[in-house]
From Swiss-Prot:
Record-given protein name: Pre-hexon-linking protein VIII
Family that this chain belongs to: Belongs to the adenoviridae hexon-linking protein family.
Keywords: Capsid protein, Host nucleus, Late protein, Phosphoprotein, Virion
Modification after translation (UniProt): Cleaved by the viral protease during virion maturation. May cause the middle segment to be shed from the capsid.
Site entry: Cleavage: G111, R112, G154, S155
GO cellular component: host cell nucleus; viral capsid
Proregion residues excised on maturation: 112-154
Biological source species: Canine adenovirus serotype 2 (strain Toronto A 26-61)
Inducing stimuli: Expressed in the late phase of the viral replicative cycle.
InterPro entries for this protein: Adeno_PVIII (IPR000646)
Coiled-coil region(s): none
Length: 224
């Protein structure tokens, strides 16, 4: 029964080329037969059989349909195209904006009424030329590109040249083709459940399980 429930083949990854570098059986899943009774052996067989069924189902879900397990060149349509990292550039300072927003912020921070309030009536009058929070906002030409502006007043501007950044998202003009990345490799090369590995002739054994198999020449190095 142990031959009917094979140990799966674990794929190795070659990061330089983006291809599989052979596969070998994971013998760490084998049990210690010297301390196992018939009942334990039966339970282990059941667990191994369930594991193989899970791996087969996972492969059907995550693998990209293809005729060759590891093609020499993966076309762009079969590859996960990773987004390019964003590029950050420094924006020039806008001294006019800083002065205008600082002046407005000084009024928002507080102030004294120009005229005494009428007796018994509290009038929420704001003095100065500051903006009202419930009314208009500063002109779009006064707002910094990075969205930073000052609400609290002061004699010194709180803006710093290091705060003015613009982030640009780059995009590749040509889709990538060739080998798979590490993220896609885990999805495409699920541990292989090779049923009855010793029941057929040697030439039926998958060549891509062999580490020194050359996918370009479709041959095994050192063998005719």
């Amino acid at each position: 029964m142990s031959k009917e429930i094979p140990t799966p083949y674990m794929w190795s990854y070659q990061p330089q080329t983006g291809h599989a570098a052979g596969a070998s059986q994971d013998y760490s899943t084998q049990m210690n037969w010297f301390s196992a009774g018939p009942s334990m052996i039966s339970q282990v067989y059941g667990i191994r059989d369930l594991r193989n069924k899970v791996l087969i189902t996972q492969a059907e879900i995550t693998k990209t349909p293809r005729t060759i397990m590891d093609p020499p060149i993966w076309p762009a349509a079969m590859l996960v195209q990773e987004a390019a990292p964003p590029k950050t550039v420094t924006l020039p300072r806008n001294h006019t904006l800083e002065q205008a927003m600082t002046n407005s912020g000084a009024q928002l921070a507080g102030g004294r009424q120009l005229c005494p309030s009428q007796i018994g009536i509290k009038s929420p009058v704001l003095a100065g030329t500051g903006i009202q929070l419930s009314e208009d906002i500063p002109s779009a030409s006064w707002i910094r590109p990075d969205g930073i502006f000052q609400l609290g007043g002061g004699s010194r501007s709180s803006f710093s040249p290091t705060q003015a950044f613009l982030t640009l998202q780059q995009a590749s003009s040509t889709p990538r083709a060739g080998g798979v990345g590490t993220y896609q490799f885990v999805r495409e090369f699920v541990p292989e459940v090779y049923l009855n590995p010793f029941s057929g002739p040697p030439d039926t054994f998958p060549d891509q399980f062999i580490p020194n198999y050359d996918i370009v020449t479709n041959s095994v190095d050192g063998y005719d």
